[in-house]
């Protein structure tokens, strides 16, 4: 009975209590964190974009880079082509001919973004000033450069990320559910950065940090953004998500695509967890508490949920048959909800939003469970194809 109570508490804690406490704290004012006065000094900036077959979005992104004001940023744009087979190379060369700030690095071997980080980390770490990592489809608006300049002056040692906002051309019903989850994640990371200056992970589409603070990135990494952000925290550097900088993240809304993405990310996060103790520095109590509350318990949710459901079969005999009834009721309820949602979509092309959200939650936790099994069994995921969910599907 005690074990059942502990399992139930952990699930309620990570999905209800912890977010509730953090969002409540986020609503409070923090007068001791007033904005510091800033100057207009020119700062060195290296912008790195890893590109694999992004011809459709690359021209707009590179055009936005040319608006970077020279009086604020002494900028250089490094575009690393990860074995692109489309016209991305020609797009970058065209910009390179018109603007000397562009540098093209072409790699024939397909390594993926983490692999390219590992290959070029020494060169990037040795540069002066700040390093801004952007996804190939992210567009920095003209006013964003001044905001970025102010933020790095106020937080010179921090890793600062833009907040994520999902968008998609897809009409799939699951886009809304994924957007709601991403919105909750964004608000939690905003709160963690605002209250503790320790946002658990950054959104990989847009973040900046001092070049010298780029950690040593190991080979065969699957998920790079969480590793880089946590390395900053362990080294005692702040991690912040800015409300003023918005990075639009493309999600497909297609169930199969999001399932594979969640599965791959979960496997990569468990791999990262084994590498974190080897990072230099010592994590504070607040950092470890946030890591456990926001990340690890989320990754353990499907295992905790299954254990809670089947625990009814192992209760003391004096509590039976209520324990069996509990287990069968939970299993039946999940099957009923998934079945009702499936039939609603097939027959009527719609289902209630609450039912849709619950079904999406269950299916995504199944993806997390598969990713956990992949990690335990030592399975390697293939290199992710970003174009699969960045273009119109």
Task: Please state what every model-predicted region is.
Residues 1-39:
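N-terminal membrane-anchoring/stem segments of glycan-assembly enzymes
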Residues 28-29, 39, 298-380:
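Membrane-embedded multi-pass helical conduit in multi-pass membrane proteins
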Residues 63-74:
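Short, acidic, metal-binding catalytic loop of nucleotide-sugar glycosyltransferases
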Residues 152, 156-184, 220-221, 228-294, ...:
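Catalytic donor/gating beta->alpha subdomain of glycosyltransferases that bind UDP-sugars
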Residues 57-60, 86-95, 117, 143:
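Acidic helix N-cap motif at the loop->helix transition within catalytic regions
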Residues 81-90, 109-111, 138-139:
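A conserved acidic beta->alpha catalytic loop
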Residues 131:
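Short aromatic/hydrophobic "clamp" motif used to bind/position activated sugar donors
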